[in-house]
């Protein structure tokens, strides 16, 4: 599950205020030493005020997913959908020290720039200094992990291979097609 988080760090962060869910999509990185998730959010995001005092949160990470046609199988099957998801629950505490927030932003940038590291966010970056007053840093202590991996694993070996190839092919093609249409 950690590999899903590292490979697909854009998370869906869910908090609840007055029985109303607040949902934000933002990158979170996994800290190998603490086992916590680290992130930051725009201070004016309504969810920011809930990211403190050990408030409960739910986090969802999404890996590749696609429709699987029965036509790819060597055996008779029904249409299905394959996907990889990781559901986490935890408690969040705020990071209030501006240097600690900067360090978390630098650490996140280092992680996201892998493997080439074409950009380095320097601690004295004036844009970061200007933005730091508008960002709330936070850390999530994960209390519950749940992997949701539906990958045709109940099929025959060749059908599993075919489903894997379809998942790879469909994701590559759908990304290219979608971005061509909207970007």
List PLM regions with ranges.
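An N-terminal domain-start capping segment
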Residues: 36-57, 165-174, 180-183
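Short beta-strand segments
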Residues: 8-43
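C-terminal edge-of-domain segments
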Residues: 95-183
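Short, structured beta-strand-loop surface elements
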Residues: 44-104
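A generic structural signal for short beta-strands and their flanking turns/coil linkers
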Residues: 9, 24, 35-37, 53-57, ...
């Amino acid at each position: 599950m950690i590999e899903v988080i590292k490979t697909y760090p854009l998370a869906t962060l869910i908090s609840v205020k007055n029985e109303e869910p607040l949902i934000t999509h933002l990158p979170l990185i996994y800290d190998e030493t603490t086992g916590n998730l680290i992130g930051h959010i725009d201070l004016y995001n309504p969810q920011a005020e809930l990211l403190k005092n050990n408030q409960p949160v739910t986090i969802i990470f999404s890996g590749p997913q696609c429709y699987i046609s029965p036509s790819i199988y060597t055996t008779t099957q029904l249409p299905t959908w394959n996907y990889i998801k990781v559901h986490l629950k935890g408690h969040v505490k705020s990071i209030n020290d501006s240097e600690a927030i900067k360090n978390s932003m630098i650490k996140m940038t280092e992680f996201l720039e892998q493997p080439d590291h074409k950009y380095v966010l320097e601690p004295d970056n004036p844009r970061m200094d200007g933005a730091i007053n508008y960002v709330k840093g936070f850390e999530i202590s994960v209390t519950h992990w749940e992997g949701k991996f539906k990958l045709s694993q109940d099929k025959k070996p060749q059908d599993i291979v075919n489903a894997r190839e379809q998942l790879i092919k469909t994701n590559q093609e759908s990304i290219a097609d979608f971005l061509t249409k909207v970007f």
